C-alpha cells in the first residue's frame, strides 16, 4: 500500500460535477486540479484532496448487491476556520443555508451546511487554549 502522509483524500458522490466544482472553488477556496466533466473532478485545499464523483464515474456504479452510491448523509469533511462567525456571515451573504446554528462545545464551535448534492461540510473553529 502506498502511503502519502501529506495528503488526505476524500471522495464525495455528487449529482452535478460542474456545479460541485463551482461550489468548492467559489465558496470554500479549493483549487481545481483536474476534471473529466460530467464524470469526475479533483479539487484541493491545503492538504485535503476532494474527489468529486458524478453518476457517470466509475465510483457511481452500483455495488454487486444493487446498492447505488448516492450523495448526502452525515459523514463530512471538516474545514478549520479562524473565525466561524465571519465565515458563516460571508457564506450566508452568498445565499448558502445551514443545517443548524453554531454549536459551541469544549473543543470549539461548529456548524454544518451542504454542497449542491447534499453532502455535508463542517466549519470548525477550535477553542482558544
List where the protein language model places each region:
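Short glycine-/small-residue motifs
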Residues: 120-123
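Vicinal oxygen chelate
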Residues: 1-8, 31-80, 88-114, 125-129
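Catalytic core of Fe(II)/2-oxoglutarate
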Residues: 13
